[in-house]
């Protein structure tokens, strides 16, 4: 069914690559005017150019989600250009290399928290008033499978994503109490084929070098479906939550992980 978000205006943070890019492209494909927000001033415009080449509407806004003054400017620009905001996808986030709690630096903990959690808080704080003026909409917060269960050596990341999960539920209840027509949900991807996996070290090898995680093999062994997910598969879930098809869905968790959270399955040889 084409045009599932036709006429809507959507903001996607972290929209220049990976899952964010896939979300921006799919929402535009389905009829939304998309604001691609990202710190990357090279890739962001490229994503927008690709969307426009396909005959769709998009604009790039440079944004550091941890900057409160910039949030005020971004929302003002959206209001000026479009006059409304229907969909907020709080996707921007980072994963810092695996480390035990003892070895993790406070600086890394704070940086991860600033982007993954503070950035989501600021997105809601500044976008919610415009969405209320619009008359309703959908807020989608990107959490993770790591936000549903503990992960050894990823305590900082899991803490931020678990925080996003409960923040989404709290905002959902706040919006429901206000009767503002805004639904709020979180999305929890599992092992997804995105550039971030090439930056996560598996640990020191016999040679003493930190090698990147072999995410394809990890997914084959850890995921009941036996493969990593694709960014567009996450985007399809976001599209559902952004569209009117999910009009009775709020405060929920959409887990898209190939069955990892459900339980164990026989390992493939």
Give residue spans per PLM region.
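Canonical Rossmann dinucleotide-binding motif of NAD(H)/NADP(H)-dependent dehydrogenases/reductases
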Residues: 3-35
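Short C-terminal tail/terminal secondary-structure segment
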Residues: 95-98, 238-239, 250-269
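Substrate-binding pocket helix/loop in short-chain dehydrogenase/reductase
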Residues: 99-101, 105-111, 139, 219
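Active-site helix of classical SDR
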Residues: 124, 160, 168
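Alpha-helical segment proximal to the catalytic Tyr-Lys
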Residues: 129, 173-177, 247
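Residue(s) in the substrate-gating loop at a strand-loop-helix junction
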Residues: 144
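Short, small/polar-rich loop/turn modules that mediate ligand/substrate recognition or access, typified
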Residues: 176, 181-183, 249-251
């Amino acid at each position: 069914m084409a045009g599932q978000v036709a006429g809507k205006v959507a903001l996607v943070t972290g929209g220049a690559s990976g899952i964010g890019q896939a979300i921006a492209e799919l929402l535009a494909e389905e009829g939304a005017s998309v604001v691609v927000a990202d710190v990357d001033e090279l890739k962001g415009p490229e994503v927008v150019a690709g969307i426009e080449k396909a005959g769709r509407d998009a604009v790039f806004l440079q944004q550091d989600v941890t900057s409160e003054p910039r949030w005020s400017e971004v929302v003002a620009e959206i209001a000026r250009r479009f006059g409304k905001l229907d969909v907020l996808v709080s996707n921007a986030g980072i994963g810092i290399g695996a480390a035990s709690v003892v070895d993790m630096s406070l600086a890394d903990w704070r940086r991860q928290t600033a982007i993954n959690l503070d950035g989501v808080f600021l997105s809601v704080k500044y976008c919610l008033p415009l969405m209320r003026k619009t008359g309703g909409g959908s807020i989608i917060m990107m959490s993770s499978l790591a936000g549903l269960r503990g992960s050894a050596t990823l305590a900082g990341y899991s803490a931020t994503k678990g925080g996003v999960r409960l923040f989404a539920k709290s905002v959902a209840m706040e919006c429901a109490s206000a009767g503002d027509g805004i639904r709020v949900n979180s999305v929890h991807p599992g092992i997804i084929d995105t550039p971030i996996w090439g930056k996560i070290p598996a640990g020191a090898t016999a040679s003493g070098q930190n090698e990147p995680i072999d995410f394809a093999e990890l997914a084959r062994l850890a995921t009941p479906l036996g493969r990593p997910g694709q960014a567009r598969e996450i985007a399809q879930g976001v599209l559902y939550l952004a569209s009117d098809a999910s009009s009775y869905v709020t405060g929920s968790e959409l887990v898209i992980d190939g069955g990892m959270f459900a339980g164990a399955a026989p390992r493939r040889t």
